[in-house]
């Protein structure tokens, strides 16, 4: 499933009409786990031909850098592909897997501290299919996100943005991350967060129910 250049037209949104505000740099420079939790309910959007297209994030996973065996920056690994993780909080890190899928991550913390949050699933605006962006590959395919976007800044006037909502916070559940059995003890760390009530969540691994943002 190769991501298209154009986003799905059913994902067109008006951030102002939805009461959304663009996230500032300070949002992304915080603790990675807090960012991963607070991204639940936020919107990931791409501007294409003058219009925003996006989805409300309903599932994320935190990756904690050199000390996390599941992270691409495990033990300080630094390759051209991983380089965006070493940048400032608020950059996009997009990687290509299995020769067919793109996965989008939000870089956190400050430069030199390579941590990130994987966007696992989102739900589009009213009228779009419930599971159109269920899973990291589907999310990127629906929004036309490819590895060409890796390293782009989500803060400022660029074509990708995280928008925060002032509405009620969703009920958030927590579980170990999906597909990281190779990571030893890190495979069991509770670093996956998802909206309990969303049909777009990609997997239903058991999770502890919590409400509100991270403390």
Regions found by a protein language model. Name each.
Residues 2-215:
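Conserved, well-structured core segments that form or line functional sites
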């Amino acid at each position: 499933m190769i991501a298209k250049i154009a986003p799905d037209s059913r994902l067109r949104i008006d951030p102002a009409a939805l009461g959304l505000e663009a996230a500032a740099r300070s949002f992304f420079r915080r603790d990675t786990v807090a960012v991963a939790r607070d991204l639940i309910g936020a919107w990931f959007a791409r501007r294409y031909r003058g219009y925003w297209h996006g989805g409300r994030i309903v599932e994320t996973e935190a990756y904690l850098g050199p000390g996390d065996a599941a992270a691409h920056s495990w033990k300080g690994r630094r390759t051209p592909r991983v380089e965006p993780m070493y940048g400032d909080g608020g950059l996009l890190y997009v990687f290509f897997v299995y020769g067919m899928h793109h996965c989008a991550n939000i870089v956190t913390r400050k430069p030199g501290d390579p941590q990130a949050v994987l966007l696992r699933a989102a739900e589009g605006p009213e009228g779009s299919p419930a599971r159109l962006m269920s899973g990291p590959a589907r999310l990127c395919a629906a929004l036309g996100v490819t590895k060409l976007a890796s390293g782009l800044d989500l803060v400022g006037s660029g074509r990708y943005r995280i928008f925060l909502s002032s509405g009620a916070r969703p009920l958030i559940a927590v579980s170990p991350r999906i597909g990281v059995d190779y990571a030893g003890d890190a495979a069991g760390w509770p670093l996956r967060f998802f909206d309990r009530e969303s049909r777009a969540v990609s997997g239903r691994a058991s999770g502890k129910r919590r409400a509100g943002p991270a403390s």
